[in-house]
Amino acid sequence: MNLTELKNTPVSELITLGENMGLENLARMRKQDIIFAILKQHAKSGEDIFGDGVLEILQDGFGFLRSADSSYLAGPDDIYVSPSQIRRFNLRTGDTISGKIRPPKEGERYFALLKVNEVNFDKPENARNKILFENLTPLHANSRLRMERGNGSTEDLTARVLDLASPIGRGQRGLIVAPPKAGKTMLLQNIAQSIAYNHPDCVLMVLLIDERPEEVTEMQRLVKGEVVASTFDEPASRHVQVAEMVIEKAKRLVEHKKDVIILLDSITRLARAYNTVVPASGKVLTGGVDANALHRPKRFFGAARNVEEGGSLTIIATALIDTGSKMDEVIYEEFKGTGNMELHLSRKIAEKRVFPAIDYNRSGTRKEELLTTQEELQKMWILRKIIHPMGEIDAMEFLINKLAMTKTNDDFFEMMKRS
């Protein structure tokens, strides 16, 4: 029996399964407690139980395997990992571990890990001699992540504008600068769907911080990938813990030469959470930001890199501006020069209900010549020269109308050449 499979089973089926095993009063219990009771009953019959999760090591030296389904929140069905196992396999926070588990003995509260079968989807022996993330060599992004799907749909228009305005590569550190109601969540969903469609080999993680619960549900249903969220009714410490778990997991996967993509909504809210959590240093910047508060969100954002030894970590984060809060302006100013790709959304364009509301002239990618062919780069530059004198709304309307006539960007450039 597998713990993860039970977590994905609907509650009604779990109750039926439990009643068939002779358990009572399940209807009044929480889902995690029902799973706990079923597994305890199952283990009494002497059969094996398997479980997996992402390791979080606590200060006392032991750790727990947390589940991504509950957004790495501590719960009764977490799996205890002993300090000796952590030392033996050289495990770190963020390692994805699967193995055989046993039910709690008398006086214990958690399931315990008996045997490690896999570390980060690899044999445990291979995990011992990997290079630490901090020691890997960072490079410019040089392998393109294409967003265009080529199916001619209206969603694909957004992806195509994105490919023209600011191409994204593996290892990009991108910032989407957005005022409220400019369609940033829709844009992120679009990017997520394009990545799942065009690059199924990449590990996609969507991290929603301080978000509305209904948007979390929508994202989980639309995105083929891991959606980890902490809603606005949870404390700041919880936002911070979720973000730390996601970035640590991503780093461990990059050490195993995987390409990981994190879509973060939003870095402003994450920085606000760190500002609440961090101990007061006595120095306060404009807008009430503590002088030490922005170091950790910068470490999160700065982890994005293309790695020479193989693998990459791409982070596309949204930053909020024009919210009327001085703190948000300060946070944006701090992150402004750190990314190597910027996409600006415009409130004016969105108010006219023209989507995607991208401010084409202000958006762009550094070192874009590494991501595109020389011929494509020339065409993109010519397009910029045509669009530059127009106003931001006219530019976007012109581009969308022209793109709608063709199915792919190559066709669009051909049409441009002829005219």
Curated annotation (Swiss-Prot):
ATPase activity is inhibited by bicyclomycin and dihydrobicyclomycin. SMART domains: AAA, CSP, Rho_N. GO terms for cellular component: cytosol; membrane. GO terms for biological process: DNA-templated transcription termination. Transmembrane segments: none annotated. Changing K184Q: Improves ATPase and helicase activity but reduced termination activity. The record marks K326 as: RNA-binding 2. Facilitates transcription termination by a mechanism that involves Rho binding to the nascent RNA, activation of Rho's RNA-dependent ATPase activity, and release of the mRNA from the DNA template. RNA-dependent NTPase which utilizes all four ribonucleoside triphosphates as substrates. Each subunit has two RNA-binding sites, one at the surface of the hexameric ring, and one at the center of the open ring structure, where RNA helicase activity is thought to take place. Belongs to the Rho family. This is Transcription termination factor Rho.
